[in-house]
Amino acid sequence: MIIKPKIRGFICTTTHPVGCEANVKEQIAYTKAQGPIKNAPKRVLVVGASSGYGLSSRIAAAFGGGAATIGVFFEKEGSEKKPGTAGFYNAAAFEKLAREEGLYAKSLNGDAFSNEAKQKTIDLIKEDLGQVDMVVYSLASPVRKLPETGELIRSALKPIGQTYTSTAVDTNKDIIIEASVEPATEQEIQDTVTVMGGEDWELWINALAEAGVLAEGCKTVAYSYIGTELTWPIYWDGALGKAKMDLDRAASALNDKLSATGGSANVAVLKSVVTQASSAIPVMPLYIAMVFKKMREEGVHEGCMEQIYRMFSQRLYKEDGSAAEVDEKNRLRLDDWELRDDIQEHCRNLWPQITTENLKELTDYVEYKEEFLKLFGFGIDGVDYEADVNPDVATDFIAI
């Protein structure tokens, strides 16, 4: 079939398998061009491995460090009549390209929050790799099914205490609007921590440790975003921030556990990027369009792949083997360039000046839209979008 982008809300409901593969190839090419990561781990598990920072982590490990990788994710396959999710095609492309280079790559597809996911992953590690040296936790989900009760818990992207009103961009109509978000209830705050906090990361690491599949010196990292006062009301000071603070709590507990065998657990605070997750957060698209333009002008712009390569090569697995620099909460800070005073001051001053008329001129809004479509495999150089493609891509993913 010939597949064109169809946007509904902040989601593109169609995906292009060839475009998704081209995206993965682009990230692999970047990683190879940077050269090998000297002290990289050789057996890596990525939970949430099919898009965004998780996918880039798997690429950095495999193509930057020559690692055998296992990926866990929850994606839908395509059929002859309907495309699957972008993450499905990303993961399929990754496996194919890794194996072509003689790298071990296997994936498990299903609910990563479930006990079955953890058990099947443990069985696979025991069977094929023995142990793992690194566990990346990069799940972004609006819903978590509690393994013990089967109850579905939903997260809320809301402020705390009072209604948050701000200038935002309507990405469907490309106009500047005033967005208001009602505050979260106590229950919604708790639920957001349950879905997006550190509990499941702890459950994963504890299950892997008890099964004896964590190698000595195993490092684990989970991803977070703090941002700046421009986005704090909806993010860090909102329900989502409470969940991210719970990640810090989990990191501390896990670090105590892993440091006994020479390992570590850290939260890595990353920069804002265009992902399906960030496009759903009110105000983020406008902030991203502003900050990207300034960072590009300053020569410090990074996408997911650049950030993660820097995290591997300049933080966790440095060439001289020295310990990673961390902040006062033991976090790896990769948002250091975005948070530079000159960049943030530029955004603060620009924010009130943005109108529908000057949006495209004063910000990288056009590029934001292009990057958003790229997530789903569209608008990529060298891909023939008039060609007939088969959305039914064969894989040997292990079903959870």
From Swiss-Prot:
Substrate binds at residue 225. GO terms for molecular function: enoyl-[acyl-carrier-protein] reductase (NADH) activity; NAD binding; trans-2-enoyl-CoA reductase (NADH) activity. NAD(+) binds at residues 48-53, 74-75, 111-112, 139-140, 244, 273-275. The active site is at 235 (proton donor). GO terms for biological process: fatty acid biosynthetic process. Its EC number is 1.3.1.9. Pathway: Lipid metabolism; fatty acid biosynthesis. The record marks 75 as: Plays an important role in discriminating NADH against NADPH. It catalyses: a 2,3-saturated acyl-[ACP] + NAD(+) = a (2E)-enoyl-[ACP] + NADH + H(+). It holds the Pfam family Enoyl_reductase. Keywords: Fatty acid biosynthesis, Fatty acid metabolism, Lipid biosynthesis, Lipid metabolism, NAD, Oxidoreductase. Belongs to the TER reductase family. Monomer. NCBIfam families: EnoyACPredFabV (NF043048), PRK13656.1 (NF010177). Involved in the final reduction of the elongation cycle of fatty acid synthesis (FAS II). Catalyzes the reduction of a carbon-carbon double bond in an enoyl moiety that is covalently linked to an acyl carrier protein (ACP). This is Enoyl-[acyl-carrier-protein] reductase [NADH] 1. It comes from Vibrio vulnificus (strain YJ016).
